[in-house]
Amino acid sequence: MKLMVLDGNSLVNRAFFGIKLLTTKDGRYTNAIYGFQNILLNLLAAHKPDAVAIAWDERAPTFRHTAYDGYKATRHGMPEELAQQMPVLKELLTDLGFVQVSKAGWEADDILGTLAAACEAAGGTTLLATGDRDSLQLVDDATTVLLATNKETIPMDPAAIREKYGIEPPQLIDVKSLMGDASDNIPGVPGIGEKTALALISKFGSLQGVYDNIDDKAVKPGQRAKLTANRDKADLSYMLGTIRKDAPIETDPAAYLRQPGDPAAAAQLLAALEMHKLVDRWGLNGGTAPAPSENAAPLETVEPSPLPLLPEGRFYAARNADGDWYLVQGQDVYLPDTDRLAAILDSGAELWAFDAKPLYRLALEHGGIGSALRFDGKLAAYLLNPSASGYEVHSLAAEYGVHAAFACEAAPDAGVLAGLCDTLAAALDESGQRKLLDEMELPLARVLADMERIGFAIDADGIRAFGDSLRSELDGILNNIYTTVGYSFNVNSPKQLGEALFDKLGLPPRKKNARGYSTDAETLESLRPYNQVIDEILKYRTYAKLLSTYVDGLLNAEAADGRVHSTFIQTEARTGRISSTEPNLQNIPIRTELGSRLRGYFVAGAGETLVDADYSQIELRILAHITGDEHMQQAFLNGADIHRSTTAKIYHIPENEVTPQLRSASKAINFGIMYGKGAYSLSKDLGIPVKEADTFLKTYLDTFPKVDGYMKDCIAHAKDKGYVETLFGRRRALPELASSNFQVRASGERMARNTPIQGTAADIIKLAMVHVWQRLRDEKLQARLLLQVHDELIVEAPEEEIDEVKRILKEEMENVVHYSVPLTTEVGVGKTWLEAH
C-alpha cells in the first residue's frame, strides 16, 4: 500500500502565507482553505496514493515542552485570520472523506514518523508531504518526503539527501543537535553553524562520534571549546530534534483509506465559501444545489423540446458541460442549433444569459448585434462579489440558496438557471449596482466580443526578425556572463546564479535564505556597483522575457487571418479593470526602447490606419475632482503642468524656478499618494534617503490638506461599511481592514485609498468604449475598435475616415463624464501601434 501523510499545520501555513487574503462576500477568510485544497489535489493527482492521512498538531503542550520550557517559545501565535479557517477546513476535509489524526502531547511530526514506520513494517511505502525539513530524517528506502517549496514540491529520497547534505537521512538529527534550530528554539551548540555541523557529522558519523573524537585534529580548538562547554545543550537538542515513531495512534495503513464522507455537505460548504472551481475539481457537480426538504415531491424530469417557430417572452440561456447552449422558459428546455440561436439573439424575445459575451460574438458573426440580450448572470455575480475565485451556475445556485425547479439530463443546471438569474438581479438592485450592469458591463460585453472577433493585425515577419536579433544578442550576453564568472552555467537557475555571484565572484551580501541565495531583481539592482556582470544578467533577463513571452507568444497566437485574437476578461480584476489573455495585450512593454519596439509589429490592415487615443493623467484628474482640492483643479483647468504646479505650491516658488529634480519628486508623490505609498517606497522610487522622502511626503500633505483628508476618509468609510466604491457605485469589499496582522491591514488601507480612483478610471474607460463603439456604428463608419490598454483606445480606420474617427474619440472619451476637472485625450495616427501612440 502507498500511504500519503500530510503535515497539516506545515502545509496550511504555507497556503495561508502564500496566497493573498481572500474572503467571501460576507467576510469569512478563505485563503488557507483554498490553498490547502489546491496542494492536496495536486498531490493526489501527481502521486495517486492508496490512502491519505492528514496529521495535525494539538494546541496542548507536548513532551518536548515538558523537557524544555524554551521549546518553540519564540514562535508567534497563529494569526486570527488563519485560526478562523481551521475548523472550517477540518470540517470540509471530513466531508470529503479524508481521515485526520492528532494526539494531545504529540506533534504532527511524530504522527508522520509513526505512520511511516508502521507502513514500512506492513510492507508498504509512505509519502510524507510537508514544508518542514525536520521530516527529512525519516527518509529511507520505503519513505519519501515530498518537500513543498515556494515554487514546487521536491521528492527527497535517500539519494537526494546524500546529494544535498553528504550524509544519511538519520544523521540530520545529529546535525540539528549541533547547529540547533532557531524556528523551534532548539539551542544546539552556540557558535556551531550548519556548515560546521555537517562537516563534523560527515567526519565522525554521529553526535556521539564527535564527542568520542573531541581531541581529533579535525576538530578546531575553537570548535572543541564550544562543544565541550555545551554538551548538555547538544544532548537536549538531539532529544528535541528526534521525531518519535511510537505515537499512540491508529497505525494500520488501511484505517486511512478515503471514506465515503458527505459529498453533498462538502459541495454545500464549498459553495458557501464561494470556491466554485473546486466544486468541479473534487467532482461534486451533482451535489451542489441545495437539497430539497424531505417532504418535497421528486423533481420532474424534462426532455429538451423543439423550439417554437417564433419564440416570444423571456428565455434564460447558458452552456451545458459539453459547451452547447440551452434555453429555458418555464419548465421547457431547448437545445437550438447555431443558426436558430443566432436568430433568437436579434428577435423580439428577451434573453437573460449566463455569460453573454460568446452570445454577442455569435450574433455579430451572423450580422446582428444581440439586441435580445438583457441580462448577464455571470457579470451580475461578479459585480456582487469581484473577489470570488470563479462564477459557475451550479455553485452560485448553492451559494444563493436557489433550488432546482426540475431536472434535465441534457442540461443539469437548467432547473436552477432562471431562479439564479432572478435572484442575482434582485441582489444587484439591492446593492445599487444594476445601472452598472445595464449601462456599462453588459454593453461592454458586446464591444469586447467584437474586439475578439476582429483581432489586431501583426507583422509576423518583423516579429521573427526581431526574435532572431534577440537570440543573437542573448548569445553574446551569455558569453559575456560566462567569461566574467569563469565557467558556463544555467543563468535561469537561481541556485546556480547565486553560486556564481556569491561563491565564485564573492559579491555581497553572502547571506542565504532558506532556499539559498536571493537573486531577485531588487537584489541584483543593489549589486550593480560591485561588478558589471550584473548589468549583463539584468539585460539577459529582459531579452529572454521579451523572446519567450512576447515574440514566441505572439507568433504562436497568430491566426490564419494574420491577426491575434485576444480573449478579454471582465470578471477577473477586483478593481473592475479589463484583462486579456492568449495573448495578453495589456502587458506589451513600453518603458524600455527595446520593449516598445514590439508595438511597431502591431499594424493596421491593408488600406487602414491606426488611430490611438490616450487619456491624459486621468487618475490625477479624478483625484483633483474627488478631493475637491482647489489648487489641483485650477492647474488642470488652466492646462498647467500639474507636477510643476504642485512643486511650486509646495515650496512657495515660481514655476519657472522648479528644478527637474523637484518636479520628479512631486510627480512621484502625485502618483504615489493614490497607491498609498509611504516614505520608504518613495525613497526607492526617487533614489533618495527615507528621511528626505518622508519630508517630501509630509510637506505635500500639509500643502494639500484636502488630499490628506480624503485619504483618511476613504479608510474610515471602508472600515465602517466594509467596502469602498467608485464614483459609479462599483463596490469592492475590504476584509483586510479588519485583520489583526499589521501588514495585511496596511494593504487594506492602501486599497481603500486607491480603489475609488483606480476603479473610477476603469469605469470611465469602459463607458468610453461603449460610447465609441456605438458612435462608429451609428455613423456607419468602417472604422473598428481594436484594443483597450489601461487608459488608451486603438481604432483601425480607412484613410478617408481618420479625421472623423479622431473627432469621435475625443468627443466621446472627453465627454463620457463631466467632473469639476475636464478629461483630456491625446490622439495619434500611424501605420503601427508604435507610430500612433
Positions of PLM-derived features:
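C-terminal polymerase-core module
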Residues: 472-479, 483-534, 702-750, 754-756, ...
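Conserved RNase H-like, two-metal-ion catalytic cores of nucleic-acid enzymes
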Residues: 3-4, 8-53, 69-70, 74-81, ...
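Function-dense linear segments that define catalytic or interfacial modules
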Residues: 360, 366, 374, 378-407, ...
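Active-site-proximal helix-loop-helix substrate-binding element of RNase H-like nuclease domains
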Residues: 152-176, 183, 323-448, 472, ...
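Conserved "right-hand" nucleotidyltransferase catalytic core of DNA-directed polymerases
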Residues: 226, 230-339, 347-356, 413-593, ...
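Extended two-metal-dependent nuclease catalytic cores across DNA- and RNA-processing enzymes
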Residues: 22-23, 73-249
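Conserved catalytic core of nucleic-acid polymerases
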Residues: 453, 561, 565-566, 570-573, ...
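Short hydrophobic beta-strand that contains or immediately precedes a catalytic carboxylate
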Residues: 5-6, 128-130, 374-375, 491, ...
